[in-house]
């Protein structure tokens, strides 16, 4: 498995993209390797289980969660992962297969506190939140989780946007539709975000990917600027491709990105929504004086953009919704909605007034 995987890594490297996330079969093999690691491969194996295995309810996540749970409960062992580290890793898996395990570990004297840390930041709890609330009646770790949810710590622990964001412009003229960002002939590769993203704008401009890479050499975040952005059919893949190039890595989640900045003279409503879902800062304003390679300063609270060298104001703007900045901070509109409702429901059960940490 390891040899095949390393060959796959080499092949993908030639295309300038990361390897595919591990599948369930590969994770099963990885588990055996972690139990008795070959000499010299220790760090590599740890990176695979930590950063290259999907989270949530992916079949590979099931295998990962089962192994980490067995480690945390002393049902198996690995020289590389003790029960404390196993519990911490369970806490990075977003929700799904890790939830039941973390709840049961709240009652463990050795790792209960670490399980509480993980659950405090886990939003995809669904009905399992009631189990934690019930357990909190006589378990201090569970009580801490419930208090954390009610205080909205999953949100307040994330950094706010800075007062000013200095960025470099990747400008595409004219109308950029979703087929430009995610071409139909390349549809088979859409589930493989990094591979599909190589096709972005290939019909529209020469060497778009090389252009973006060159802009990144400035060390500044790249902001996507277009006259009319995201028209055409609804395609989440269009957002995925754009954010692959201008977004930020999601910790512990392979081959997917969030955040990023998109400015359009006009942004199509459905495309705007998918950007918002992914935690991007997206807004409409006059882009006529923003050119490829310009360094700009975006003031997200004062709602203006200025040119960095001349300090000339290029445009002012308004957000389409008053909760947009909360969504950016939360890592997307979807985590914001789910997390806010977890906080609200917990406060309701505790008979507390509505939380003030969110913009309503």
Where are these regions (language model features)?
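Eukaryotic acidic, Ser/Thr-rich intrinsically disordered low-complexity regions
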Residues: 2-5, 121-155
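Structural detector for internal amphipathic alpha-helices that build alpha-solenoid repeat scaffolds
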Residues: 15-20, 42-59, 80-95, 101-104, ...
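Amphipathic alpha-helical scaffolding segments comprising HEAT/armadillo-like alpha-solenoid repeats
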Residues: 24-32, 55-74, 94-106, 125-136
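Intein/HINT protein-splicing elements and their conserved insertion hotspots or analogous self-processing inserts
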Residues: 144-163, 299-360
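Feature captures the catalytic cores and cofactor-binding loops of soluble hydro-lyases/lyases
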Residues: 187-306, 311-316
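Conserved, function-defining core regions and hallmark residues within catalytic/recognition domains
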Residues: 146-219
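Amphipathic alpha-helical packing elements
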Residues: 2-31, 36, 324-328, 333-337
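Short coil turns that connect the paired helices of HEAT/ARM alpha-solenoid repeats
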Residues: 36-40, 73-81, 104-112, 136-140
């Amino acid at each position: 498995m390891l040899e095949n995987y390393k060959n796959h890594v080499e092949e993908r490297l030639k295309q300038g993209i990361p390897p595919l996330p591990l599948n369930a079969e590969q994770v099963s093999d990885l588990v055996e390797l972690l139990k008795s690691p070959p000499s010299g491969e220790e760090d590599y194996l740890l990176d695979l289980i930590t950063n290259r295995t999907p989270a949530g309810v992916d079949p590979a996540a099931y295998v990962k969660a089962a192994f980490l749970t067995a480690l945390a409960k002393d049902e198996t062992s690995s020289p590389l992962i003790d029960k404390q580290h196993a519990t911490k890793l369970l806490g990075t898996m977003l929700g799904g297969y890790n939830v039941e395990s973390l709840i049961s570990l709240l009652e463990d004297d050795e790792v209960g506190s670490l399980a509480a840390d993980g659950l405090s930041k886990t939003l995809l709890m669904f009905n399992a939140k009631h189990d934690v609330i019930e357990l909190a009646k006589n378990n201090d770790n569970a009580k801490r989780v419930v208090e954390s949810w009610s205080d909205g710590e999953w949100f307040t622990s994330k950094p706010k946007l800075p007062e000013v964001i200095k960025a470099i412009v990747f400008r595409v003229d004219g109308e950029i539709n979703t087929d430009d960002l995610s071409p139909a002939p390349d549809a088979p590769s859409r589930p493989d975000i990094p591979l599909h993203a190589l096709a972005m704008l290939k019909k529209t401009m020469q060497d778009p990917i090389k252009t973006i890479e060159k802009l990144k050499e400035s060390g500044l975040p790249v902001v996507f600027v277009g006259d009319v952005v995201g028209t055409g059919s609804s395609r989440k893949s269009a957002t995925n491709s754009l954010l692959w190039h201008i977004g930020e890595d999601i910790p512990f989640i392979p081959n997917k990105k969030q955040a990023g900045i998109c400015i359009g003279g006009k942004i199509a409503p459905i495309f705007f929504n998918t950007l918002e879902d992914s935690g991007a800062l997206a807004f409409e304003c006059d882009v006529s004086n923003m050119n490829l390679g310009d360094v700009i300063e975006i003031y997200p609270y004062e709602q203006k953009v200025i040119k960095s060298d001349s300090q000339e104001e290029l445009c002012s703007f308004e957000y389409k919704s008053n909760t947009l900045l909360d969504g950016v901070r939360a890592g997307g509109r979807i985590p914001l909605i789910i997390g806010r409702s977890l906080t609200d429901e917990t406060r309701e059960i505790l008979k507390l007034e509505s939380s003030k940490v969110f913009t309503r």
